[in-house]
């Protein structure tokens, strides 16, 4: 029996919408990353982008458990000596919740060209409104 390898022209992409309100950030992000990779499909192939598009709404209402809002830091570096910038997640979620969610998903995807291609299929919005109604997205039920 031969192993099945998905080809780019055989892949049918769907659009899903996920409501992140009141759900833990890591749990939602891990399931979104799985759908972006295509691991929910029987034709999943690790080196081919078989994933679907995902729209995340209410990104500002995502939960962080424990004391993570105050203790966990969002870090980036300017590449200059002493250029480490740290922002508590409470402040980052108030200013740019879309970025916080996108970074959580990005870190769960493969590093490299394929991961960047997968991340382009993620659309994150603040609030319940999004501009992808024309794609007729289905509601994605989260497992937990």
Curated annotation (Swiss-Prot):
SUPFAM superfamilies: Ribosomal protein L13. It holds the Pfam family Ribosomal_L13. GO terms for cellular component: cytosolic large ribosomal subunit. Part of the 50S ribosomal subunit. NCBIfam families: rplM_bact. InterPro entries: Ribosomal_uL13, Ribosomal_uL13_bac-type, Ribosomal_uL13_CS, Ribosomal_uL13_sf. One of its GO terms (molecular function) is mRNA binding. Keywords: Ribonucleoprotein, Ribosomal protein. It comes from Clostridium kluyveri (strain ATCC 8527 / DSM 555 / NBRC 12016 / NCIMB 10680 / K1). The gene is rplM. This is Large ribosomal subunit protein uL13.
